[in-house]
């Protein structure tokens, strides 16, 4: 009996060892399928496309479907996170070799979790966040304001760089004297601080970064400039007008762990950088690209409503590092959009400073009434009737047409960036020569548009025969069918192997998902759209809902059958309140019989409930789709067995 028992024990022992080794091997095999997701939208071009996805495909999603297998919790904030999750595979942690997902919450608590199942690895608290109030967010969507932007991971050093807004006196009050932004440098393996938090600070063009409350929503980017590894970030302000209300960009030197340069983007007011959370684009040569929002423009030191190219020069010898605007292109100014001054009469100094200052936080939105509105009937390019609504409202509202409401799609292979904002107009811009718009150029907008790589187009919707680059920019002051057409998602880039052409996907407010071809010269050609609408529950209730959809894509190289596109949209107006969301997975290559984009999976069909995160696109990696929600966590979707 004892011999039989000992024999059984040995069998059980060896079986346990076998199971352990099998599970460990399976985990390592699974880990090898994960791709690094080191920055928002996967790469420095902000393509939003993972080209190395081997498990999710049109066939696997269509035949097996996906299911939400867990919700990974964030810590300390009811809404969870505004940053996009980041992933660094194959990290040796105190809990073994793991694919680490980094999740910074708005409560300034960063979690490192296993990307496969969300299990905890480490947690780091980075200081007291700022409590939400109408001073910061007129809608009070968020509970706290802490780690707002997406950080960046350096794969060589396994370090996370994350900027967070901290109440240095622990009061949580939005006071510029005590509420400051700090760069945190954490080891991705265990979350420990590599150095003490570094204060973001400095003056530029007479503007003091810490004299006003900034909103550092724009994500970070790491690149090599003149051989020097550097992190860059940008910010806007809580209030866009008034003394000191300027956008800023800053540089952080990786080797020294010190801030090395700072640049105010206007000597006047505005020119904030937010791009709905997107970060700067960094090309292989180290040049940086961004789009600013509302504010002054003079083409010299005031860069509101502009597409900018920045050049960073590292410190050398006795010379300090510098960050400068080296080129730009500007479509119009706030002052002209409000009709307060003709372009031909603009003064160079403070050229577009709006006389009707917008004193509400930057997410205030538009209050549109159809009373006394002027109506024009047109027919869209797709043959559908469109009613153009020109609201009878204070002209100052039209100084809130943020061109920088979305990040640009910069397709390095053809040297073109497509930038679009709240008008929903896509402007193809030559990266090698942006155009250098002057105040005089703005007196003749059609001539200014000739500097573009190709003519602009209505990207998020079609209002019919309306010139997207008119002689009088005030003719753009309308809402199609009474709803806004803003773009907030950065267009997703995909080289379609069947078309043998670059394509982009955009999802504007109160509209459908659109697919466009981009040729070698930057010319945009409409291809298809979905049947599904963003903010479907409030379309037609002027001004409709915000912010449109957010998407990410994946494929296994150039295999056209492997490509999928995952998008989230709100049912209601996610700017004014917390609303339910919808997750859709599309076939981005093969169109349906009616020419529309094919839906492979729809959360609505399976009654999957989640609260929509209004600035965060999904992450597709390793056979999983991660969807940050406003329930305080991240939904993890996987293929069903």
Where do the language-model regions lie?
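Short secondary-structure subsegments characteristic of cysteine-rich extracellular domains
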Residues: 101-106
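An edge-strand/N-cap motif at the start of beta-rich repeat modules
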Residues: 31-52
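Conserved, well-structured interaction surfaces
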Residues: 82, 86, 110-111, 147
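Bacterial N-terminal signal peptides
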Residues: 15-27
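Extracytoplasmic/lumenal domain signature
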Residues: 33, 52-79, 92-97, 108-142, ...
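N-terminal secretory signal peptides that target proteins for export/translocation
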Residues: 1-14
């Amino acid at each position: 009996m004892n011999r039989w028992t000992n024999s059984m024990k040995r069998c059980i022992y060896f079986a346990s060892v076998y199971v352990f080794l099998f599970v460990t091997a399976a985990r390592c095999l699974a880990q090898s399928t994960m791709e690094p997701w080191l920055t928002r939208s996967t790469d420095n071009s902000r393509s939003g496309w993972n080209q190395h996805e081997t498990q999710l495909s049109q066939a696997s999603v269509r035949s097996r479907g996906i299911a939400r297998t867990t919700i990974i919790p964030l810590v300390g904030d009811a809404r969870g996170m505004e940053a996009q999750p980041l992933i660094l595979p194959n990290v040796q942690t105190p809990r073994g070799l793991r694919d680490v997902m980094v999740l910074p919450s708005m409560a300034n608590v960063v979690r490192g979790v296993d990307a496969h199942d969300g299990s905890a690895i480490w947690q780091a608290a980075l200081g007291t966040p700022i409590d939400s109030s109408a001073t910061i967010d007129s809608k009070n969507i968020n509970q706290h304001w802490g780690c707002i932007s997406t950080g960046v991971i350096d794969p060589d050093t396994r370090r996370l760089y994350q900027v967070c807004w901290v109440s240095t006196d622990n009061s949580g009050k939005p006071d510029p004297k005590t509420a400051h932004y700090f760069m945190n440098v954490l080891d991705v393996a265990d979350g420990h601080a590599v150095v003490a938090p570094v204060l973001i600070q400095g003056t530029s063009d007479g503007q003091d970064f810490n004299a006003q409350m900034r909103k550092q929503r724009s994500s970070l980017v790491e690149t090599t400039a003149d051989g020097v590894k550097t992190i860059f970030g940008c910010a806007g302000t809580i209030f866009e007008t008034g003394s000191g209300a300027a956008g800023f960009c800053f540089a952080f030197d990786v080797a020294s762990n010190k801030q090395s340069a700072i640049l105010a983007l206007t000597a006047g007011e505005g020119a904030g950088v937010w791009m709905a959370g997107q970060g700067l684009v960094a090309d292989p040569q180290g040049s940086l690209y961004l789009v600013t929002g509302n504010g002054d423009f003079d083409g010299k030191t005031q860069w509101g409503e502009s597409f900018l190219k920045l050049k960073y020069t590292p410190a050398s010898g006795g010379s300090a590092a510098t960050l400068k605007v080296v080129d730009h292109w500007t479509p119009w100014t706030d002052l002209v959009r409000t009709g307060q001054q003709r372009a031909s009469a603009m003064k160079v100094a403070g050229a577009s400073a709006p006389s009707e200052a917008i004193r509400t936080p930057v997410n205030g939105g538009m209050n549109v009434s159809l009373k006394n509105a002027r109506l024009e009937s047109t027919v869209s390019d797709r043959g559908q009737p469109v009613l153009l609504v020109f609201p009878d409202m204070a002209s100052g509202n039209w100084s809130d047409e943020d061109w920088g409401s979305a990040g640009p799609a910069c397709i390095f292979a053809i040297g073109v960036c497509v930038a679009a904002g709240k008008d929903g107009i896509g402007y193809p811009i030559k990266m090698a020569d942006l155009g250098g718009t002057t105040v005089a150029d703005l007196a003749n907008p059609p001539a200014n548009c000739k500097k573009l790589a190709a003519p602009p187009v209505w990207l998020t919707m079609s209002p019919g025969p309306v010139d997207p680059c008119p002689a009088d920019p005030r003719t753009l002051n309308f809402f199609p069918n009474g709803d806004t057409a803003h773009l907030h998602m950065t267009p997703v880039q995909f080289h379609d192997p069947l078309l043998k052409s670059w394509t982009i996907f955009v999802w504007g407010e109160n509209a459908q998902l659109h697919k466009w071809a981009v040729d070698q010269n930057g010319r945009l050609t409409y291809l298809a759209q979905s049947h599904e609408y963003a903010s479907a529950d409030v379309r037609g209730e002027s001004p409709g809902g915000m912010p449109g959809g957010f998407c990410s894509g994946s494929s296994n190289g150039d295999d056209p059958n492997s490509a999928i596109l995952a998008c989230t949209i709100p049912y209601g107006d996610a700017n004014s309140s917390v609303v339910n969301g919808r997750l859709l997975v599309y076939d981005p290559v093969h169109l349906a019989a009616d020419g529309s984009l094919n839906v492979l999976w729809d959360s609505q069909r399976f009654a999957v409930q989640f609260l929509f995160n209004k600035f965060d696109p999904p992450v597709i990696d390793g056979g999983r789709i991660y969807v940050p929600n406003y329930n305080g966590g991240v939904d993890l979707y996987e293929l069903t067995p």
